[in-house]
A protein has these predicted regions:
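Helix-rich effector regions associated with P-loop NTPase G domains
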Residues: 1-35, 43-51, 56-62, 69, ...
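Canonical P-loop GTPase G-domain recognition
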Residues: 69-135
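Conserved active-site beta-strand-loop modules that form the wall/rim of enzyme catalytic pockets
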Residues: 96, 143-146, 164-165
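Intrinsically disordered, low-complexity regulatory regions enriched in Ser/Pro/Gly/Thr
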Residues: 29-30, 85, 138
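Glycine-rich phosphate-binding P-loop
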Residues: 131-154, 169
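Structural beta-sheet core signal
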Residues: 38, 64-66, 134
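Short, well-ordered alpha-helical segments in soluble proteins
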Residues: 109-120, 138, 149-153, 173, ...
């Protein structure tokens, strides 16, 4: 059985009942909003793009926000912004912890919905709030983003901000991942529990990727010699554990503890 099959066979552990309820609620409420803003993780934009959310919200104007851009490579983020733009999708990069993000996001929404706002003005609906559904997978910073708006809470899910009504939806995943890469990426950022995968194998996969893209940063972070880059991934994990003093009796490296670091 492949790792992807193992992950999907354990879906009950990472797709609890409340996520099913969230998808049903989304299907019910989508007709009551003017726009959908999906929060993605700037480090893994495609892996954090939920196909179930895409399916449910397909009929509404759709915007994306690449959150946690402070943790991503800025040059790669520029490429992702260009990618979304080429696909005709409104998109911004942001750090939801940074002050002033709410203003930039509101500007994007207003730009995307300019035609709708003009129609409303022509009909005398000047005071009508724009209703925006905020969606995303767990742990992409959606709550921090919502809290960046100095708004007034109306009920359990609605927040009023200036000319906007924001509908905050709980983070939700989808039932089956199409690849091990997607599942691994989601585990890396904490969107699914990392114990669904073998933690040491997961860490080795991450080290292998980082070593290929950012070798010097890897060496600097763990104070390793250049020779470490030639090691097999598991040996590299052991070298990092040894540097950090993560040893067990007999002087062996505690690779499980190192992998969780």
């Amino acid at each position: 059985m492949s790792q992807s099959d193992i992950i999907n066979s354990r879906q009950i552990q990472w797709f609890p009942g409340h996520m099913t309820k969230t998808l049903r609620l989304m299907e019910k409420e989508i007709r009551n909003v003017d726009c959908v803003l999906q929060i993605l993780d700037a480090r893994i934009p495609l892996s954090s793009l939920n196909p179930e959310i895409e399916r449910i919200t397909a009929g509404q104007p759709h915007l994306s926000a690449l959150n946690k851009s402070d943790l991503a490579d800025p040059e790669i983020t520029k490429q992702w912004l260009a990618y979304f733009k080429s696909a005709g999708a409104g998109c911004i990069a942001m750090d939801s912890k940074q002050r002033g993000r709410a203003t930039a996001t509101k500007g994007l929404i207003e730009k995307e919905l300019s035609a709708l706002m003009e129609r409303r003005r022509s009909r005398g609906m000047v005071g009508a709030a724009i209703r925006v559904m905020i969606v995303g997978i767990p742990n992409v910073g959606k709550s921090t983003f919502i809290n960046s708006f100095a708004g007034t809470t109306r009920g359990k899910q609605w927040i009023s901000v200036d000319s906007f009504d924001l509908m905050d939806m709980p983070g939700v995943l989808w039932k089956k991942f199409d690849s091990l890469e997607t599942a691994s990426n989601l585990a890396f950022i904490g969107s699914i529990r990392d114990d669904i995968l073998d933690i040491e194998e997961l860490a080795c996969g991450l080290l292998s990727s980082v070593r290929g893209i950012y070798p010097q940063q890897l060496l600097a972070r763990y104070k390793l010699d250049a020779e470490a880059l030639t090691l097999p991934p598991y040996d590299l994990l052991q070298a990092i554990g040894a540097k950090r003093g993560m040893l067990i009796s007999g002087g062996e490296v505690d690779t499980e503890r190192t992998a969780k670091m």
